[in-house]
Amino acid sequence: MLNPVLAGQNLTADFFNTSIDNARSMKYQKTDLTRNNTTTYLDSTDLVIALAAGAAYTFEGLFFYDTSATADIKIRITLPTGAVSLISPWSSGTGISATANPLNQQAVADVSDVNEWIAGGVAIGTLMSIRPVGWINVTGSAGNLTVGFAQNTASAVNTLLKQGSWIALTRVF
């Protein structure tokens, strides 16, 4: 329970607002972001959520992207120093050739600070998605969860993280 109620405690608006604000957070990408001919990450300013010290969260996201089969895409989440996570995405593997490809479940990553996933592109104009879910435990300091993306292989085409991509966290303790 985020804010346990104690016998004799006054229940105030501030108490309830804090409980509600910290229980579930969701952010979405407001505009398309573009990377062209670079493998350097660009962090989204929309897909950022503050994480509390000593808290644990379930994590889920859905990232829509558009890229070529040459460039593919890599997406990462960066966590506060000392945070640990178990997150695994469902996505298309690299080397795909059409939108009807087998689903690729990547291995669960027991990672601290940064999680990175690579997913395949088909052709410019073909939207694809990557769907990570998992657990985040902030054992150290508070900080932000931030989503970034880049081309996996530099290519002179646009790789887009599409508007409507989203992340959501539910605090469990």
Which residues are covered by each model-predicted region?
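Acidic, negatively charged sequence signal
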Residues: M1-P4
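Surface-exposed molecular-recognition determinants
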Residues: G8, N17-F173
